[in-house]
Every structure is written in C-alpha cells, then in structure tokens.
Amino acid sequence: MRDPSAVQAPVVSGPPPSRQFEDATYAKVTRRLVPFLILCYVVAYLDRINVGYAKLQMLRDLRFSETVFGLGAGIFFIGYFLFEVPSNIMMHKLGARLWIARIMISWGIVSACTLLVRTPTAFYGVRFLLGLAEAGFFPGIILYLTHWYPARRRAKMVATFMVAIPLSGILGGPISGFIMQFFSGVHGWPGWKWLFLLEAVPTLLVGVATLFYLDSGIRHAKWLNEEEKQLLEGNLAEERKFKIEHPSLLAVFSDGRVWLMSWIYFSCAMGQYALTFWMPTFVKTAGVKSVLNIGLITAIPYLATAATMVLLGASADRRLERRWHLAIPMVAGAAGLVLSVEASLHTVLAILFLSIAAAGVIASAPLFWSLPTAFLSGAAAAAGIAVVNSVGNLAGFVSPYMLGWLKDLTHGDRAGMYCLALVTVAGAATVLAVPAKMVNR
C-alpha cells in the first residue's frame, strides 16, 4: 500500500512537509541511479586507463618505443574528439539509456581486441576505435541526469558521479597488477593480454545490464509512485519555462569566455592524463619492481585525490569561492610533478609527491566545471560546455605523446614533467585572471 502521508505531502500547505517529501523523493532517485552510474563509469574508465599498466609488459614484448606508446595512448582522444558531436546527435534521437548501453558494449569489445595488437599501426588503430566507441559517454550521463534532476540539484549529482574517476584508479591499480602478475603465462599469454580481456568483461556485462536497469525516463520508472513522478516532472517542467533560445554555433565559437575556459580545462587535463597513462611507469621508476606492488601503490595517489575532491568541493560551495580553490590545487599539483621526478631515487618521497600531484591536477576537474556553469546557462551552457570539453580533452592526445617523445629524446622523465608543470601553472594564472564576480556564485 502507498503511504498516505506520501500521497498528501506534495499538496499540504506550508513548506516543511513539501520540502521533506521532495528531499525524500530525490534521495530515492539518487539511491536508484547514482551508484549504478558510478559503476558504469568505473568499469568503463578501467578500459581507458589499463593501457598504462599494460605498458609495463607490452612495450618489451612488442618492442614499442616510448613515443609509440605515447602516440597510441593519446590517439584515443582524436577518435573521441571527432565522434563526440555525432554521438551526441544519435543520443538525442535514440535516448540516453540505449546509447549509454551501446557505448559500453562496443567499448568493451574494442578494448578486448587490444590483446590482438602486434604492430604500432594496429595499436594506433585499436586506440582510435576505442575513442570512437567511448565518444559521448560522459555527455550521455549528464544528459541522463537532466531527465531526473533540475539544475539546482544537478551540480551535486555530477560532482558525486565524478568521484568515479579516483575510485577507478583506487580499484584499477591493484586489480590490474594482480591480473598481470598472476595470469602471466596462463595458456601461453602474457599478463597484459589477460588484462585487456578480463577487464573488458565487466564493461560488457554492465553495458547489457544498463538496458534493463536504467529507465528511459520518469514515466517509465516502476519504482516511483504517481505522486513522486508528478513532483519530478513538475520540477523539470517549471525549469523549462525559463530556458533560453538555442544560440547559434557562431555565437558560441565567438564567445571569448568559452575559449578561455577551454584553455584552463586543457591545462588541467594535461597533468591529469599524464598521470592517468604514466602513473605505473613513474612508480616503477621510483624503485618498485613487482607488477602487483606497482598496482597497489598507484592506488595511494588516487586515495589522496578522492579525499581532496570531497574537501575542496565542500569548501568551495561553503565559501562561494571558485578561483583560488582551483588555482591553488593546480599550483600544488605542478609542484608535485616536478618534485616527484627530482625525488625519483627515493621511493617514499616520490610516491608522496606523486600523491600531491594527483590530488592537485586530477581533483581540479570537478572544481573547474563550477567556472563555466557559473556564467553559461540554458542552451548556451549545453553548447559552450560541449566546446570546452572537446577542446580541453585534446590534452589527452598532446600530454602522453609529448611525454613519450621527450622520454625517447632525453632518456628521462624530467623534461616532460617540467613541461607539464609549466602548462599547469600557466593555467592556474589564467584562472586568477578570471573576474571573481563572474564565477564566485
């Protein structure tokens, strides 16, 4: 039976019952959706970053240079960049639920095919296809959340969802290290081949589960009663009254603020993707030899990142201050990058500085997104954020390729880390140049 109080709650006069009913309804939606969406992102993100762990063995087996690896890791983002807009168009036509499932299933299949790589060309090809397969996944999640949450509740949900990034690092390191060490030689396969195969399986399974677990919209949710559906639909309908008209692409591309945000995001992402793909190598350089131990130790910087995300996000919201909360971690992350390479002969210090670097540059991502969303609204936000995300993610190509090329050129990590630190500091300086009144909301 339905709870009589729940039925009457939306229409009872006075704010306390209505507020209580609304909060309870959104809490119910969050319990149903957000943990599953985080699971989707964690298993999918593992397929993106496991190449960094596979590198520990596959470069030797396939005789790839550091430059080949860097280009292969980065070319993923060229496919991602080229197919993101077409993917978003298809998502609007078919619906976020179906398209997210399609992304995950095709992503898992392509990731598993990486075990067939023999040549640099094949490596580049499969990474490019992986980028095509993943394109639209993050925007798809954001779009799906807009079908349930109004803007005033959406920011918190996005921030909660993005905890999946450090969580995937915390889980991915030990799991990848375990697979590579204990499956190496099974049926004559090296550990890196088993890594690509076994970590693709959860992505495929969760992709199929998405078709059955997620609902296409509020009306299709059998786990909500009619009063809860009316509340959710009413809030979204009320919000739609204030939507602005769709801006032209020319207006978006001619807005200097959009390009300013693109540069800042690019500078954040340079360090983030460097650590994503090269963290296992940096840990190995610091003196850790066992593949399993490398996987376990790489979880430490991601633990620091998760804690930093939560603390900085709460502080920024409480103080309504955005610029310094973003600039300071970026500078700290840049310092961590430089100090980690200078302390590479001292394992404990190197891991400590890598943790500072990760906490600074990776935790900057959710903090960054509070900037453009502070002055972009409605359709302008949708178009502007798409541009910022696409341009900024090109750092995923530039960063690993630059690191690999400089490592082959100089036979060390120092030049690459200093370049990353310089870009990150320049981005932090740009953040402080943004007028406070534009973003501190």
Label every model-predicted segment.
Residues 92-104, 317-330:
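Cytoplasmic membrane-interface "Motif A"-like loop-to-helix N-cap segments
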Residues 156-180, 202-203, 389-399:
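Glycine-rich segments within core transmembrane alpha-helices of 12-TM secondary carriers
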Residues 51-52, 252-309, 365, 369, ...:
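Extracytoplasmic gate region of multi-pass secondary transporters
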Residues 126-163:
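Cytoplasmic helix-loop-helix junction between adjacent transmembrane helices
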